[in-house]
Each structure stands twice: as structure tokens, then as C-alpha cells.
Amino acid sequence: MDESKKARSGDKKKEKAVAGILPHSNKPARVPLIAVPSHPVFPGMFIPIVLISDSDMKAIDYAMKGNGIIALFVLNDKFLEKNNNNAQQKLIIDYSKDIYSVGVTGKIIKKINLPDGGYNIFVSTFDRIKFVKVVLNDKFPIIEIDYLKQIPVRKDDIQSKAVYGSILLRTKEIFAHRKMPEVQLNMVNIEDKGKLCDIVASTISSSKNDHQIVLETLNVKDRLKKVLELIYEELNLIEIQNKIAKGIQERLEKQQKEFFLKEQLKAIKAELGIGDKKSSDLEKLKTKLKALELKGEPLEVVEKELEKFSLLETSSAEYIVVRNYLELITELPWRDFKINFDKLDLQKSKKILDKTHYGMNEVKDRIIEYISVLKLRKTQKGAIILLVGPPGVGKTSIGAAIAKVLRTKFFRFSVGGMRDESEIKGHRRTYVGALPGKIIQGLRITKTNSPVFLIDEVDKISASSYGDPFSVLLEVLDPEQNVRFRDHYLDLPFDISNVFFILTANSVETIPRPLLNRMEIIEISGYIDNEKIEIARKYLIPKVLSENGVDKDSLKFQSSSLVQIAQEYARDNGVRNFEKYLNKIVRKVARKLIENTEVKSYQISNDNLEEYVGVPVFRKESMPNAMYSGMVMGLAWTNYGGSTLMIETVKTESKVGGIKLTGRLGDVMKESANIAYTYVNSIKGDLSISKSFFEKNIIHLHIPEGATPKDGPSAGITIASAFISLALNKVVRPHLAMTGELSLTGNVMMIGGLKEKIIAAKRSGVEHIIVPKANRVDLEEIPTNIKSGINFYLVDNMREVIKLLF
């Protein structure tokens, strides 16, 4: 019975040997396992291994108490990727899945304790082994292993001999390129082909998988072929590395040679006392341009221009052109200027705007909204705003205040009367004296790509044979295009989308519709007398006193004198003329202070105002002393504010009826007069007007101050009311004024400039105003202090107007 068991056991051992597995014999079948994350270890090596995990160190201590034999297996890639290439001690390893199945045995020759608590062991490796199973995994793994037997090459195998010879030859080439010691070269000259493969594979910088394949290949013939493949891959890699190294070496040698020659040239010129202006300019430009870190098209253009510049003589005209062009590039803000959004304070911003400008609430609110959006977005974004209003209301000066609020730079340029588009977009460099346009010049001066740009008087641009500046502004103000704005002189794409554009105009009538669509329009109305006086007290008087060196205690203004200046000298919508008269007064006082040092203080009142500013420029507006039939007061709006407009009509007998117009009326107002005439004629029966009135009379319509041009549609209902008053021979109710456009069917349509018209009416003592019902919203937005003391009547048909006339 025992003999049969032994026989069967012997048969099993023979079967294992045939399969490439050696019987255990006297070698240990169970050993501690060390899992390493690096490349596989081959038999016949002497290697150091650093261990830091507790389980590995305990396994080493256990092995050294016995025969010192350990098993070395490599962690596979799946495990390392899953654990981010970290093989630290706290990771849980499933040895049946996480290690390669073939490893080696090794004997611990020496152990060194490391300062951080780890071990550095030196191991001599022996046999290829196969992982069978874990038999104990308490504090460290002990595994059962099978010893693998390699299949040797037959002595008469000519192919293997040829491969063996190639390996010897190519390995020596690799060692020669790597400049390895002669000891390692001698190691190659061994007869054992399997051992040769292991030694060569361990010295080649192949992948972990390739090394593992060599380790797992038990057939030496196949192992020879695999190693030869790896050798050729290594030689190809060496060839590529040598080419790269050679190219780098050649470039370095060329640079060193150029540097040496340049230094020699500098030394020779210094010895001869010859200055090298071009070299100095070139070096300065290169240093500045390098700091910009340009990319793409700008970098390519700069490199070409630098190369051209280096070949030019300083005496040539093009030398200056190229240098100026490169200097422009160095001075432009190519990098983003970052606004510190946390420092943008809404309350402080509001205070700054209120301190510098009175009123203008819509503009201030828009700026506060813009700052709020910036703080929320945390990214820069430009804006395009058009301020429309009469002269002198602060449209231009508000730009500097906005820049201060946004903590950025301010740049202003006027386009009033501009006819050449090159002023905005630059001249091409082929022209003599070419310059960049105002946009690029502004960026160059402010040195930031997010400044506040104020483009003044945009409504006064005029087209010519030199191009249309309006068309250029379309590109500048289009968010889709200004990301890559291309100035003719610079001829490179430049991002101006972060610029805060403010444009000013007195009227939008001359601005093309496509340009208006690109802008947010904010209308700034003129100031009433009370507002002008408040502005004078808070802003203008301290300003003119400071500018003229007059102490505030040396000059006082009575309130009545300021009212008189506003009403009789500076009646425009703005405060520019008001400031001029204040300046005139202060200058005269300054002269008196110098000429008569005994008088220390002066006071301006109604009694002495004419002494300083002369006779009044305007008469005080009021209702006529006497009203007649055919007379009606209308209201007009101009770029300089509102005014009253007295419509006068008389009839003269004639065989043929008709209408005669005088008072320098414009085409639109003439059409309004004809429409009013036709409308009243069409309803004469309803108003009990005789048929002969229009058939046998010529109606003469006149608007006084004939030297002043007058135009616009808003006098339609006023003219019709004058015709009705004349036809009925009735005087309209006292202190009545009106404004509204009249259609041919009697509808009353919307008008503009309502606030200014009401101000003018109030100044003239008007108590009743007829307004189109379509202007209800405009009327509600007008401050109560302006509307106080006036009764308003909203109408949408001429018949409603007629009921209010008498």
C-alpha cells in the first residue's frame, strides 16, 4: 500500500518536471513574500531593496531567523493604477490578483536599518518560482511556491546560436554607448544562454511588462528571441537620443560661437571708440519683447521684424520705421489688466460720482450696476454707452469720474469734424509719417487693456473721400469684432473688448442706425434754474475761486444774483456759460483785490451784477401783455434747451384762399402748417366756421424772431389751434401753452424734449400745458418740483384740444 503511494507520488513529480516545474527537493516550499512595485528581478542578481511597510519588515525579520530565503514578486499595473502607483504599507493586497504569478527566490545577504525606521536589504536571487497560494497572512504573507525549470537549448540548434551571437554583439554596442564598466562587459561573455538573457534583460531600459515576459519565458530559445527584440528597440532608442543630443550640441556650439564673435566685435568697437547704436537698440527691444510672452501671429510678426531690423543700417529710413513699430508693440498692454474686484465698493463709488457731478442719476445708476456685475462675475467685461444731451451738462467730465470709480485709466479724444477714418484706425506703415489710430494710441498711453475711453462729439463726424469714420466705429464698438480689432498701423489682432467706451453727442439724428444699435443710449436732460444754482454753489464757485487764486472769504454771492445769472445770462441747458460768467466775475474781483488792498471782501448782488458781467443777454420770458385771436403759445426744443414759441396768424381777403408762412420755418414745420390748415378746413362745419373763411382769405402764419431757424413736427396742434382761434375770432384762455404733433386725421402724436419744454413754459409763467397722451410716461418721470404750479392736460385727438382752448 505504501509502495503504491510512493509510486504515484513519484509519477506526479515527474509530471511537474515535464511541465516546467521542479520538485521541491530540499528547497523551501513555503517562504515569506515581498511585493515590490518596481521592475521584475531576475535570477542570478545581487540587488538592494528599500522596505518601509510594517509587513515587509516583519517578513524580513522572520526570514533572517531561519534560512534567510524570501520570495520576490512584482505588483501588477492594475493594482498600482488603482492605488495611484502607491505601494505603501496601509494598502490591502490580494496576492492572488495583485501580483504577477512568476517571481524569484532570494537570500538576504545583509540588512541595514534606516533612520526613518525602514530596512535596506541586499538580496542575492536564485530560482524562478510560481505563486501557488497564501498559506498564512497574519502579520505578513507566507506563500506556497513551485520552482520552475527552464527548457534549455539543444546544442545543435543553429538558429539559437545565431541569436546568441547577435545578442553578444549588440549588447556590447549598448554597453559601449552607455559607457559601462569593463566588468559588466565581461559578464556578457558567458556560455549559459538562459543566464545571459537574464543579465542582458536586467540592463535594458524596457517596460515592466517586457521584463516580466522575459522572466516568465521558460523556453530559453524563445527567451533569446525576446531579448534580441528588446536589444534592437534599445539600439533604436539610443540612436534617437544620440541624434537629439547631437542637434543640441551643434546648437550650443553655434550659440557659443556667435556669442564669442559678438563679444569680440564689442571689444574691438570699444577699443576703437565706435558706439554700436543698432546693437544697443536691438538688445533693448529683444529684452522688452521677450517679457511680453507673445504667442501666435504677434510672435511671428515680431520675429520677422527683429530679423529685418538686425539687417538694416542705422542710416536707412526704414530703420526708424521698423524701430518705431517694434517700440509700439513693446508699449502695448498685451496681458490682461486685472481689476481687483474686492476693492470696488458700491457706496464709495456712489460718493465719488455724487462729489464730482450733480444729478445725472441714470448715468450713475448704470455705473453702479456695471460695478455690481463685475463683482458677481469676477471677470472683466467692457461696456458701450452713448450719453446724449445738450452742451455743458457734464457728459465729458463724467468719464474721468467713472475711470476713478473703476480704478483704471482714462483717455479722451474728440471726433467732432473728423473726416478721415485713419484717425481712428491708423495709417498703413507704407505712408510717410504713418501713426497708429486713436484706439491704439489710447491703449499705449494708458498702458492697460481695460481703460475708460471717452469718444466725444460723435454726432459731428462727417464722411469724405478719405473714408467714413462711422464705419470704423462700427467695428470698434461691435463686441463680436473688437475682440480682434486690427489697427492699420499695428496690423495685428488686439483685444479691446474690455474697454469701457463712453460716447457723447448732442443729438442722435446724424448718427447711423446700425451704430446706435450697438450702444446703450442714456439721455441727459438740461438743468433747470434751481439745479444750476445748486451746481454753482457746490461745484462751480469753489472751482473758479481756486483757479483764480481768490479766497472764499473774499467773494460772496447772494442767491438772487445767481438766479439772475441763470435766467438772464446763462439760459442754456448746461452750466458751461454759467461757469464763464462766474469766471468773469471772479477775475474782476481778483483785479480789485490787487488794485485796492484796503477792501478785503466783495459781495455780488442784483444791484451790482451788471457791473461785472454787463447788460443781460436774454429778456425775461413771459406771456404777452395782450393776447388776440389767432395767437397761441407753443413749446419748442433745441440742442440748447427748451423755449416758448408764439404762433401768430392773421387773415387777409383774397379771391383765392391759401396759406402764407414766414418766420424762417423748416420743411417739417411747413408740412405741419399745411396739415393743420387742411385738418381745420376739413372740420370747419363741426366748428361752425363759415365756408368762405378758407375760400376767400389767405391765412398768414408767422413765428417771431424770424432770424432764428425753426423746425420740427411738435407745433402741429399749436398751429391748428391758432387757425381755429382766428376762424372763430376767439382769444384762447390765458397762460395756456401746448405741444404735440398733429396727423391729417386729427390724432395727437408723441413729441420729444418734454422736460425742457416744461422748464421753458414755467419760466414764462405758463399755468396750463396740453401734452400728447402718448407722453404720459415721460411726464411722470419729470421731477415734481419742475411740474409744480402747472396743470397738465393729456390728449390724443385734436377735438380734445379744441375743448380746452377757450
Curated annotation (Swiss-Prot):
Family annotation (InterPro entries): AAA+_ATPase, ATPase_AAA_core, Lon_bac, Lon_bac/euk-typ, Lon_lid, Lon_proteolytic, Lon_Prtase, Lon_prtase_N
Localization annotation: Cytoplasm
Residue ranges of domain Lon proteolytic in the record: 626-806
Expression induction or repression: By heat shock.
Main location: cytoplasm
GO molecular function list: ATP binding; ATP hydrolysis activity; ATP-dependent peptidase activity; sequence-specific DNA binding; serine-type endopeptidase activity
Keyword Hydrolase belongs to the record: yes
Active site as annotated: 714, 757
Cited Pfam families: AAA, Lon_C, Lon_lid, LON_substr_bdg
Assembly description: Homohexamer. Organized in a ring with a central cavity.
Protein name: Lon protease 1
Organism: Borreliella burgdorferi (strain ATCC 35210 / DSM 4680 / CIP 102532 / B31) (Borrelia burgdorferi)
Gene: lon1
